[in-house]
Regions:
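Non-DNA-binding regulatory cores of transcription-related proteins
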Residues: 61-127
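Basic amphipathic alpha-helical segments that dock to polyanions
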Residues: 52-62
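Amphipathic alpha-helical interaction segments
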Residues: 18-21, 35, 54
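Short capping segments at the starts of secondary-structure elements
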Residues: 26-32
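Intrinsically disordered, low-complexity serine/threonine- and proline-rich regulatory segments
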Residues: 1-18, 24-25
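DNA-recognition alpha helix
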Residues: 32-44
Length: 127
């Protein structure tokens, strides 16, 4: 991720490097904005929430990370591949990589792109 940041002209400041480290270590666990803030502020207490948010937005815009909203909280992840985020009854979010499900998901994405133009993300709520 550091190389991608450099390629896009972003400086590798200590705070940004800490954010990259946190996302790399915790990104597959879909941390919330508040969880990321607590983690980065433990090492860089003077960093502002807006700096963290602006960096997360920039990384999302560059497709280095992705974000989604769950129960009013923005969650972040580093998995760029097509996948399903499964929310467990206890609130844990995990990636599903079942090939049969992914096959159907690719078909749905293809149909949506054909009928609804291009899509960036797809959220399905099934409770």
């Amino acid at each position: 991720m550091k190389e991608k940041l450099k390629r896009h002209g972003l400086k590798l400041t200590p705070q940004r490097l800490e954010l990259v480290k946190i996302l790399t270590e915790r990104g597959r666990h879909h941390p919330s904005f508040n969880e990321i803030c607590r983690a980065i502020k433990s090492k860089h207490p003077n960093i502002s929430h807006s700096t963290i948010l602006n960096n997360l937005k920039e990384m999302t815009k560059l497709s280095l990370i992705s974000s989604f909203n769950y129960k009013g909280e923005t969650r972040y992840e580093v998995n760029p591949e097509l996948h399903v985020n499964l929310v467990e009854p206890n609130g844990t979010i995990r990636d599903i990589k079942n090939e049969e499900i992914l096959k159907h998901l690719r078909e749905i994405v293809k149909l949506l792109n054909e009928k609804e133009r291009s899509i960036k993300s797809l959220v399905i709520l099934a409770e």
